[in-house]
From Swiss-Prot:
Pfam families: Proton_antipo_C, Proton_antipo_M, Proton_antipo_N. It comes from Staurastrum punctulatum (Green alga). The lineage of its organism: Eukaryota, Viridiplantae, Streptophyta, Zygnematophyceae, Zygnematophycidae. GO terms for molecular function: NADH dehydrogenase (ubiquinone) activity; quinone binding. This is NAD(P)H-quinone oxidoreductase subunit 5, chloroplastic. The chain crosses the membrane at residues 9-29, 40-60, 67-87, 88-108, 124-144, 147-167, 185-205, 219-239, 258-278, 289-309, 327-347, 395-415, 427-447, 486-506, 535-555, 613-633, 649-669. GO terms for biological process: ATP synthesis coupled electron transport; electron transport coupled proton transport. Belongs to the complex I subunit 5 family. It is a multi-pass membrane protein. InterPro entries: NADH_UbQ_OxRdtase_chlpt_su5_C (IPR002128), NADHpl_OxRdtase_5_subgr (IPR018393), ND/Mrp_TM (IPR001750), NU5C-like (IPR003945), Proton_antipo_N (IPR001516). Its EC number is 7.1.1.-.
C-alpha cells in the first residue's frame, strides 16, 4: 500500500486544476457563464472526489501500517541556505485529508442548490476549489516554509470568500477585518519560523524537533529566546483559529455565503490553526510555560465564546461563537498534552458544525421568500420559530447536530468533549471546572438556538409589515441537493464518536482512534478508562449539559414562545435584580463583550490618528519642502531673467570678472 503514498501530491493538485479550469472558463466565456454552471459544479465536485478517494486510500494505509512517509525534493540550494519542498503522509495528515475532502464534497454539493440563483455561481466554485486545494496543501506540508505559503493562501481565499458579495458594505468591511486581524498572527508566525531556523538551522519539522530537544538537553540554547519564538509561532494559530484576543474577525466572517461559513468553521481555516499546534506540539512540550499558555488561552476562549453566544439573535453569528468556544476546547486539550483527545474533538466537531451551518443555510434559504432577502431578517431568529413543521428534514438534522455539540451521548462530540474534561480535571483542575461550566453554557445557547428556530409558533409573518414582496405560505423545505448533504453529515455526527469510545477489556484496549493515531515523542497521554469508569466520569458533563438544555427549554421552549410577540419574547429588560443580571448578560453578548469597542477606541482609533499625523507631515513638510524648492527655482529664474540685456560683450565682461574673482578668492585662501 506504500505505492499510493507516492501519489499523495495529487490530492491538492486535483482541486487546484479545477480552479484553474474554472478561471480559464470565466476569462474565456464571460457572457456564457450561465450555461457553464452545471459544468463548473461537476468539474469541482469530480476533481475533489478524486482527491477524496486518494485520501481514503492513504487513511486506510495508515490504519494498517501506522508509519510516516516523507517525500522531499530540493527546491533552492545555496551555500547559505537549503530549501526543500515535499509532503508528509502520517496519521495526522491522513485524517485531516479525509476531513477536508469529505466536508468539502458535502459543501460543494450543497452549494449547487444554495447559490443556484447567484450571479457569481462559477466564481464561487472557483474560490471553493482554490480554498480546498490550499488547505490540502497545508496539511501535507513537510516544513515550515511550505506550510507558511499555504497558510497565506488559505488566508487569501478566506478574504475572497468572506467578501464574495463585495457590493455589500458589511461584507467588504468583514473581509478586510478578517484579513488585517490574521496579518497580526501571520507576522508572529513568520517571526517564530525565522527564530527556530536561527536556533536549529532547519525548517523541517522532524529536524527542528530533534535538534531543539538536543540543544535543550545540552543547555546550548537560550530558553527565554526559545519561549519567545514558540509564543510567536503560537500567535499564528491564535489568529487563524479565532482564539482570544484575535477572535474578533470570526463573527463578521458570517457576511459570506453560508456554504463557505460551513467550510471555514468545520474543515479549513479555523482547523488550520489547531492542525499547526498539533504538528508543533513536540516542540512546545519541551517548554512548560508555552504549554500552559496554550491551555489557558484555550479555556479562556471557550468560556468567552460561550458567553458571547448566549443572547445572539443572528443564527449564523450564534454558531460562529459556538465554533470559537469549541476551538478553545481543542486548544485546551493540546495545551494539556492530550494530543489524541484534541484531534478527536477536531474531527467530531467538524462534522457536527458543518451539519449545523449547512442546516442554518437551509433555514435562511427557506426564510427568504417569506421575510425578504435582507440578511438582517432572514438570519434573525426573532422572525423564526416553528420551522420544523415546514422543514422537517432540516429540523431533524439540526437537532442531531445540536445534541452532538452539547455533548449528549451517544452523539459524536460527547466522547471527545468528555475526555477533554476528564484530562483537564486530572492535570489542571481549575481549568477543568471552567471547561465544565462552559459545557453547560454550550448546551444552553445551542438549545436556545434550536428552540427559537424550530419550535413554537412561526413569527416570520411579522416581516410582512415591512416587506410587501413576501410569501404568505411560510418557509419551505430545501431542494434535494441541499438536503442530501445534511443527511449525509448526520451519519458521522452520530457514529464517528464511537471510534474513541473507551472499550477496555482486561489489559487490551480496543480504543480504535488511539490504535492507529501515531503520537509524536514526548506527548503525555491520559490513561485509558473502562466503561464503568468512563460512565462515572461522564455524569458531571452530561448532567451540566442536560441542565443547560432544561434551562433553555424553560425560557425559550415552545410553551414560552407561543402567542408572544417578538419584542416581548426577546427583550430582556425587566425590573429588579433579575432584570439587572439579564440586561448585563444581554449587553455583554450583543456588544461582543465590549472587546470590539475597546479595539476600536485603542488600536483602530490610535492607528488612524497616527496615519492622519503622518498624512499632515507628508503634506505640509515633505511635500512642502519639495514644492518650495520648485518655487525658489521659479522665483530665482524670474529674477535673473530681468538681468539679461542681450549683449555678448556684457556677458563676456561678467564672465571675466567672475573668473578673476574666483581666482583671487582661492589665492587668498591659500
Amino acid at each position: 500500500m506504500q505505492l499510493i503514498d507516492q501519489y499523495g501530491w495529487l490530492i491538492p493538485l486535483f482541486p487546484c486544476l479545477s480552479a484553474l479550469i474554472l478561471g480559464i472558463g470565466l476569462l474565456s466565456f464571460r457572457r456564457g457563464t450561465r450555461s457553464l454552471r452545471w459544468a463548473s459544479a461537476a468539474i469541482s465536485i469530480a476533481f475533489l472526489g478524486f482527491s477524496m478517494m486518494l485520501s481514503f486510500g492513504l487513511f486506510w494505509d495508515q490504519i494498517l501500517n501506522n508509519s510516516a512517509h516523507i517525500y522531499i525534493w530540493s527546491w533552492i540550494t545555496t551555500e547559505a541556505v537549503s530549501l526543500q519542498i515535499g509532503y508528509i503522509i502520517d496519521p495526522l495528515s491522513s485524517i485531516m485529508l479525509v476531513l477536508v475532502t469529505t466536508v468539502g464534497i458535502a459543501v460543494m454539493i450543497y452549494t449547487d442548490g444554495y447559490m443556484s440563483h447567484d450571479q457569481g455561481y462559477v466564481r464561487f466554485f472557483l474560490y471553493l476549489s482554490l480554498f480546498t486545494a490550499s488547505m490540502l496543501g497545508l496539511v501535507l506540508s513537510s516544513n515550515l516554509v511550505q506550510i507558511y505559503a499555504f497558510w497565506e493562501l488559505v488566508g487569501m481565499c478566506s478574504y475572497l470568500l468572506v467578501g464574495f458579495w463585495f457590493s455589500r458594505p458589511s461584507a467588504a468591511a468583514a473581509c478586510q477585518k478578517a484579513f488585517v486581524t490574521n496579518r497580526v498572527g501571520d507576522f508572529g508566525l513568520l517571526l517564530g519560523i525565522l527564530g527556530f531556523y536561527w536556533i536549529t538551522g532547519s525548517f523541517d519539522f522532524e529536524t527542528i524537533t530533534t535538534r531543539f530537544s538536543e540543544l535543550l538537553n545540552t543547555n546550548n540554547v537560550n530558553v527565554s529566546f526559545a519561549i519567545v519564538c514558540s509564543l510567536l509561532l503560537f500567535l499564528g494559530p491564535v489568529a487563524k483559529s479565532a482564539q482570544f484576543p484575535l477572535h474578533v474577525w470570526l463573527p463578521d466572517a458570517m457576511e459570506g455565503p453560508t456554504p463557505i461559513s460551513a467550510l471555514i468553521h468545520a474543515a479549513t481555516m479555523v482547523a488550520a490553526g489547531i492542525f499547526l499546534v498539533a504538528r508543533l506540539l513536540p516542540i512546545f512540550q519541551n517548554l512548560p510555560i508555552v504549554m500552559d499558555t496554550i491551555a489557558i488561552t484555550g479555556v479562556s476562549t471557550a468560556l468567552l465564546g460561550a458567553t458571547l453566544a448566549l443572547a445572539q439573535r443572528d443564527l449564523k453569528r450564534g454558531l460562529a461563537y459556538s465554533t470559537m468556544s469549541q476551538l478553545g476546547y481543542m486548544m485546551l486539550a493540546l495545551g494539556l498534552g492530550s494530543y489524541k483527545v484534541g484531534l478527536f474533538h477536531l474531527i467530531t466537531h467538524a462534522y457536527s458544525k458543518a451539519l449545523l451551518f449547512l442546516g442554518s443555510g437551509s433555514v435562511i434559504h427557506g426564510m427568504e421568500p417569506t421575510v425578504g432577502y435582507n440578511p438582517n431578517k432572514s438570519q434573525d431568529m426573532g422572525y423564526m420559530g416553528g420551522i420544523r413543521k415546514y422543514m422537517p428534514v432540516t429540523g431533524i438534522t439540526f437537532l442531531i447536530g445540536t445534541l452532538s455539540l452539547c455533548g449528549i451521548p451517544p452523539f459524536a462530540c460527547f466522547w471527545s468533549k468528555d475526555e477533554i474534561l476528564a484530562n483537564a480535571w486530572e492535570k489542571m483542575p481549575i481549568l477543568g471546572w471552567i471547561a465544565w461550566f462552559t459545557a453547560g453554557l454550550t448546551a444552553f445557547y445551542m438549545f436556545r438556538i434550536y428552540f427559537l428556530t424550530f419550535e413554537g409558533d412561526f413569527r416570520g409573518f411579522i416581516a410582512k409589515k415591512d416587506n410587501k414582496n413576501t410569501n404568505k405560505s411560510g418557509p419551505h423545505e430545501s431542494s434535494v441537493n441541499m438536503v442530501a448533504p445534511l443527511v449525509a453529515l448526520s451519519v458521522p455526527t452520530i457514529f464517528i464518536g464511537f471510534l474513541g469510545a473507551p472499550l477496555v477489556l482486561g489489559e487490551t484496549s480496543s480504543l480504535l482512534f488511539s490504535k492507529w493515531l501515531h503520537v509524536p515523542d514526548l506527548h503525555i497521554e491520559a490513561s485509558e478508562l473502562t466503561w464503568t469508569e468512563f460512565a462515572l466520569e461522564s455524569l458531571p458533563s452530561v448532567g451540566i449539559a442536560v441542565t443547560g438544555a432544561c434551562i433553555a427549554w424553560i425560557i425559550y421552549g415552545p410553551h414560552a414562545s407561543r402567542n408572544r410577540n417578538l419584542v416581548e419574547f426577546l427583550d430582556p429588560s425587566k425590573k429588579g435584580i433579575l432584570g439587572v443580571i439579564l440586561n448585563t448578560i444581554y449587553n455583554w453578548s450583543l456588544r461582543r463583550g465590549y472587546i470590539d469597542e475597546l479595539y476600536n477606541k485603542t488600536f483602530i482609533s490610535g492607528t488612524r490618528n497616527i496615519a492622519n499625523l503622518f498624512f499632515v507631515f507628508d503634506q505640509w513638510v515633505i511635500d512642502g519642502v519639495v514644492n518650495n524648492i520648485g518655487l525658489l527655482s521659479l522665483f530665482g529664474g524670474e529674477s535673473t531673467r530681468y538681468g539679461e540685456v542681450g549683449r555678448t560683450t556684457a556677458y563676456l565682461f561678467v564672465l571675466v570678472i567672475t573668473t578673476f574673482s574666483l581666482f583671487g578668492f582661492f589665492f587668498i585662501l591659500q
